[in-house]
Amino acid sequence: MDLPPQLSFALYVAAFALGFPLNVLAIRGARAHARRRLTPSLVYALNLGCSDLLLTVSLPLKAVEALASGAWPLPASLCPVFGVAHFAPLYAGGGFLAALSAGRYLGAAFPLGYQAFRRPCYSWGVCAAIWALVLCHLGLVFVLEAPGGWLDHSNTSLGINTPVNGSPVCLEAWDPASAGPARFSLSLLLFFLPLAITAFCYVGCLRALAHSGLTHRRKLRAAWVAGGALLTLLLCVGPYNASNVASFLNPNLGGSWRKLGLITGAWSVVLNPLVTGYLGRGPGLKTVCAARTQGSTSQK
């Protein structure tokens, strides 16, 4: 069942109204910390903040589109630009959360060995690789398989379809035969792989916390911090990617689910700054790393 256009519009507007100031504050806070001491976590937080800010800027147009029942309100030539601005940060955010998770897991489980590779320059390289992977894969899908692409035999502009009602639609009226595999490939590489990495790393972090000397209260706080990124991936970006899997398995499924998933994905711009901001201030996992490092040093 589709959400009413007015409700979809209100949810997009609310996500923009909350997400824009939160991400601006998150980026400013990360920059302030970076001036004192740049760490890999700050590099990932800065990239995640910029990614979410780009996604946030695209939400007003998504709100207008929802209010118009999916009709594209701008010139057709701007559809590919909007597609990259909206979907690239939606996928890149999962990669940055996975990288942040991996860094914290390595710091908690292997504190001495990780220190040798804990360099911001390596983290910048990881972020550049994530951006390149997302943009290249997304660009190939758009150019080859989107409406108006090389493998599409229509004469429409790239990304634009015109259903029977005559209103142009941007990226939401693909032929199911080509849309299903294309979207599934994006979800498999750019969501489910980062999700698996994040889940594995945070289970490892929780095991490290269980064997640490922290108080019960600080263990609970650190455990909540550890689950924040995983919870964001599952609650915000998970429904959209689940709809991609459903439409791949059955082209008749996933339409309404996809619209709801795009809305929950938009709300990642609200939760991500809260998660990364809390991670940046929380002492839990850093204390675990310090305790384990001191313990390993004393044993020597």
Curated annotation (Swiss-Prot):
Record topological domains on the Extracellular side: 1-8, 65-79, 143-178, 249-256
Segments passing through the bilayer: 9-31, 42-64, 80-101, 122-142, 179-200, 224-248, 257-279
Molecular function in Gene Ontology: bioactive lipid receptor activity
Compartmental location: Cell membrane
Annotated GO CC locations: plasma membrane
PANTHER family: FREE FATTY ACID RECEPTOR 1, FREE FATTY ACID RECEPTOR 2-RELATED
Descriptive protein name: Free fatty acid receptor 1
Naturally occurring in which organism (per UniProt): Macaca fascicularis (Crab-eating macaque)
Lineage: Eukaryota, Metazoa, Chordata, Craniata, Vertebrata
Gene name of this polypeptide: FFAR1
